[in-house]
Amino acid sequence: MQLIGIIEEDFINYKKISMTLEFPYCSFKCNKEYGSNICQNYQLNEYTIKDYNIEHIVSKYINNNISESIVMQGLEPLDSFEDVIEFIRYFRYVCNDDIVIYTGYEENEIKDKLLILKQFKNIIVKIGRYIPNEHSHFDRVLGINLASSNQYAINLEDYRI
């Protein structure tokens, strides 16, 4: 599995303490859409991509008494969809804790992927691109503030297409 980093104890991106997996790829759709470098995570593009063993990551998670969830974030996890699915499949063999996936895609752009992810329990997806000069708002599903008013999280167990 290719990542640019792992944060073993993250207190920021979800209401539960998380292990955060940082994914290495993104098409920088936000920058293209708004015609400027607005990406909050652009500097991550310069990080070194490393290969990680999924079993090792899951073992570190299971043996950490603090983390209660997994967060997958940017760059863009859904641009590494095969790695995302492979990780979730292995993780679900040993644990049913929440998995939160942060994406800058809009819901209509990823319905096919949401249907695939829906087969797994306790998957939450934060949807929506960052829009500059927007007011942040509290998202009840994540239990945190999101940067733009168009962004929201859905629990895929409640998701209907």
Describe the predicted segments one by one.
Residues E22, Q73, V100-G104, G128:
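A cross-family glycoside hydrolase active-site/sugar-binding cleft signature
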